[in-house]
C-alpha cells in the first residue's frame, strides 16, 4: 500500500559467523554489540555502525542511508627520543587508565531508533578504570602517522584524570613509563564517531 515504513541499517550483520539480529521492545529497536576489555595493537574490536532511519513507501522506493560510527577511535604516535636512537625499544603494552572508571566495556544494546543522542547509544556497558592493548612494536625516532590505533566505547561522562601506562622492552629489559594526566579544564570525554590522537615520546 501507500503506507510508509521506516528502514533501519546497521553493520556488521554477523559476528564470528553468528547473525546479529534486531530486537524490539516497547518501540525501541536495537542490536547487541560487544566492546572488548582488552585488545591487540592490530585491533580486534569490531567497528559498529548505525544509520538514521529513513522512510520508504510505494511512491518513494529509492532511499539513501548514511552510516555513523558508534565507537570512538583513539590513536597514538609513540616514538623514542633521539638520545635512544642506538637502543632497541619495543612497545609491549599500552594501559589506558581512567581514574574514575569512565572507560566502558562489555555487552550493550546499540539503539537503532530514537531522537537526539538516543540514536546509536550503547546501553548496558560497564565502567572500568583500565583497557589494555598488547602487542610488539619496535619504536622509531620519528613517525609520519600513528603507529597504534584502537576502537573503544564513548565515555558516559568526562574523566578528569586520564593517563597512559606503557610497557617497553629496552634492550631486553621491560620498563614501565606512565604519562602525566591529560589536562583539560572540563576533563576528557571521548565521543562516538570522533578520532582522538595522542603523541607520546619515550626517553631512556
Describe every region a protein language model picked out.
Residues 174-183:
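Edge beta-strands of extracellular beta-sandwich domains
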Residues 115-121, 184-198:
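Short, surface-exposed linear segments at secondary-structure transitions and domain or protein termini
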Residues 84-125:
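Short, ordered, surface-exposed loop/turn motifs in non-cytosolic proteins
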Residues 1-90, 95, 132-148, 160-170, ...:
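Short, low-hydrophobicity acidic/polar segments
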Residues 116-142:
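Active-site/ligand-binding surface loops and adjacent short beta/alpha elements
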Amino acid at each position: 500500500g501507500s503506507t510508509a515504513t521506516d528502514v533501519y541499517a546497521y553493520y556488521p550483520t554477523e559476528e564470528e559467523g553468528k547473525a546479529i539480529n534486531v530486537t524490539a521492545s516497547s518501540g525501541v529497536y536495537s542490536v547487541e554489540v560487544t566492546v572488548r576489555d582488552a585488545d591487540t595493537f592490530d585491533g580486534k574490536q569490531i567497528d559498529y555502525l548505525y544509520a538514521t532511519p529513513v522512510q520508504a513507501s510505494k511512491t518513494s522506493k529509492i532511499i539513501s542511508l548514511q552510516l555513523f560510527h558508534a565507537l570512538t577511535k583513539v590513536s597514538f604516535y609513540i616514538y623514542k627520543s633521539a638520545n635512544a636512537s642506538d637502543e632497541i625499544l619495543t612497545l609491549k603494552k599500552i594501559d589506558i587508565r581512567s581514574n574514575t572508571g569512565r572507560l566502558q566495556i562489555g555487552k550493550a544494546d546499540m539503539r537503532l531508533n530514537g531522537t537526539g543522542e538516543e540514536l546509536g547509544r550503547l546501553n548496558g556497558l560497564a565502567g572500568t578504570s583500565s583497557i589494555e592493548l598488547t602487542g610488539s612494536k619496535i619504536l622509531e625516532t620519528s613517525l609520519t602517522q600513528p603507529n597504534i590505533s584502537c576502537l573503544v566505547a564513548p565515555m558516559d561522562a568526562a574523566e578528569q584524570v586520564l593517563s597512559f601506562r606503557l610497557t617497553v622492552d629496552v634492550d631486553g629489559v621491560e620498563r614501565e613509563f606512565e604519562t602525566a594526566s591529560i589536562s583539560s579544564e572540563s576533563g576528557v570525554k571521548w565521543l562516538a564517531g570522533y578520532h582522538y590522537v595522542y603523541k607520546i615520546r619515550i626517553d631512556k
